[in-house]
From Swiss-Prot:
Enzyme class: hydrolase
Listed InterPro entries: Glyco_hydro_1 (IPR001360), Glycoside_hydrolase_SF (IPR017853)
A GO term for molecular function: glucan endo-1,3-beta-D-glucosidase activity
Similarity annotation: Belongs to the glycosyl hydrolase 1 family.
Effect of residue 273 to V: Increases KM for substrate about 5-fold
Protein name: Beta-glucosidase 7
Residues annotated for a beta-D-glucoside binding in this entry: 57, 158, 203-204, 343, 414, 461, 468-469, 477
Location(s) in or outside the cell: Secreted
Primary residence: secreted
Alphabetized UniProt keyword annotations: Disulfide bond, Glycoprotein, Glycosidase, Hydrolase, Secreted, Signal
Length: 504
């Protein structure tokens, strides 16, 4: 009997172990060269590793807790705008599950969490009345992060303008946004700044200008041919200008009113895809540089040098707003560090420049995107049609910023890849392609750091599968799988890869 009971116990233990392995996903994944020579110790001593999300993509409670609607609420609730007519009303419900998510970060050995504050959760109308229930939520999240030893990196704006400000003032087309944003930022600095020491003003303002005012696919859906009206040749430049002035005003407020006592820093998050010349021809080389100037230079040149890139001034001419001397002084040097969201790369094919009839910001580049060279793709494609997996693009971006802009402090604020929506749970959990993605991109980042690039941290996008904007829930960027029927979280192989890599 004793032997039989022992055998039964052994069978039970083995069965439980198999179930645990199946649930973890990573435990059953083959691990040849699992870490690829990477470890925490391979990076600089104070280098920060974290994960990132944004408010509308994960919080839920969109119409509850005193929150006012944002432009994304109105957009997602309009049929036909988002895949499957999905929205962020519930998302991953981090509003109620933040402790579970913070505990997950801690178990995976992350140092920091980059999240955004929903402006309309603090100010339901974008200005005036404060929603104390929203303030309490962010206080609770920040306090719990610190309790668990995780550093908050707080982004003040991630696409989600309060709808009231769009309706009342016309949103980012109105120069008054600088004052409105500064008052919102001031409240956040005053309320949370005794615990938050790492701030970002905006996430990807270029994307807002491109998709919201040039192509018209995202809110507020303005473009030359859009039903809502707009001008793709002028409005993107006006919006970008107002973002830069709003950023500079908020940073000036922090530096004069709070920085001495709080000892924090404020940066901005910019997207940067690497552009490689298709050939050594003069036209292709010039096209690649032009693309970099119209992409990252649009924001970094003013922030570092106080003016827009010369090629933009030459091609865009009087459609490009001008900084007054006082504005240029405020904008120049207004970022304590630069956040870079880096995902992909493409080849650039050039042409002889010509003075053409202005049609759009995109057309002003006068380049052709190419994704293969001599019949060889630039890299495998992830689920998103824009996302080619090109690890050396990470090196290209970081090294370029070092060389062109005097090696400012950079934080990689997003980096990741997505899976499609038609996989089984087991396939989601066994995300070996994502493991390879992170291993190869971090290897290229380490190479740039070893060569002198001033990079202070890295944030994986994203902690959770979440609401991925136009794609709704059909695009899965998380290192943690979310069952959107139950909202249960299950770490993927990539999550365990980070856990193991960050142990040493």
């Amino acid at each position: 009997m004793a032997a039989r009971r022992a055998n039964c116990a052994l069978v039970l233990v083995l069965a439980l172990a198999l179930l645990a392995a199946r649930d973890a996903g990573a435990a059953a994944v083959p691990k040849p060269n699992w870490l690829g020579g990477l470890s925490r110790a391979a990076f600089p001593k104070r280098f920060v590793f974290g994960t990132a999300t944004s408010a509308y993509q994960v919080e839920g409670m969109a119409a509850s807790g005193g929150r006012g609607p944002s432009i994304w609420d109105a957009f997602a609730h309009t049929p036909g705008n988002v895949a499957g007519n999905q929205n962020g009303d519930v998302a991953t419900d981090q509003y109620h599950r933040y402790k579970e998510d913070v505990n997950l970060m801690k178990s995976l050995n992350f140092d920091a969490y980059r999240f955004s504050i929903s402006w309309s959760r603090i100010f339901p109308d974008g200005e005036g009345r404060v929603n104390q229930e929203g303030v309490a939520y962010y206080n609770n999240l920040i306090n719990y992060l610190l309790q668990k030893g995780i550093t908050p990196y707080v982004n003040l704006y991630h696409y989600d303008l309060p709808l009231a400000l769009e309706k009342k003032y016309g949103g980012w087309l109105n120069a008054k946004m600088a004052d409105l944003f500064t008052e919102y930022a001031d409240f956040c600095f005053k309320t949370f700044g005794n615990r938050v020491k790492h701030w970002f003003t905006f996430n990807e303002p270029r994307i807002v200008a491109l998709l919201g005012y040039d192509q018209g696919t995202n809110p507020p859906k303005r473009c030359t041919k859009c039903a809502a009206g707009g001008n793709s040749a002028t409005e993107p430049y006006i919006v970008a200008h107002n973002f830069l002035l709003s950023h500079a005003a908020a940073v000036a407020r922090y530096r004069t009113k709070y920085q001495a006592a709080q000892q924090g820093k404020v940066g901005i998050v910019l997207d940067f895809n690497w552009y490689e010349a298709l050939s050594n021809s003069t036209e292709d080389q010039a096209a690649a540089q032009r693309a970099r100037d119209f992409h990252i230079g649009w924001y970094l040149d003013p922030l570092i040098n106080g003016h827009y890139p010369q090629i933009m001034q030459d091609l865009v001419k009087d459609r490009l707003p001008k900084f007054t001397p006082e504005q240029a002084r405020l904008v120049k040097g207004s970022a304590d560090y630069i956040g870079i969201n880096q995902y992909t790369a493409s080849y650039m094919k050039g042409q002889q420049l010509m003075q053409q009839t202005p049609t759009s910001y995109s057309a002003d580049w006068q380049v052709t995107y190419v994704f293969a060279k001599n019949g060889k793709p630039i890299g495998p494609q992830a689920n998103s049609n824009w996302l080619y997996i090109v690890p050396w693009g990470m090196y290209g971006c970081v090294n370029y910023i070092k060389q062109k802009y005097g090696n400012p402090t950079v934080v990689i604020t997003e980096n990741g890849m997505d899976q499609p929506a038609n996989l089984s749970r087991d396939q989601y959990l066994r995300d070996t392609t994502r493991v390879h993605f992170y291993r190869s991109y971090l290897t290229q980042l380490k190479k740039a750091i070893d060569e002198g690039a001033n990079v202070a941290g890295y944030f994986a996008w994203s902690l959770l599968d979440n609401f991925e904007w136009l794609s709704g829930y059909t695009s899965k960027f998380g290192i943690v799988y979310v069952d959107f029927n139950t909202l249960e979280r299950h770490p993927k192989a990539s999550a365990y890869w980070f856990r193991d890599m960050l142990k040493h």
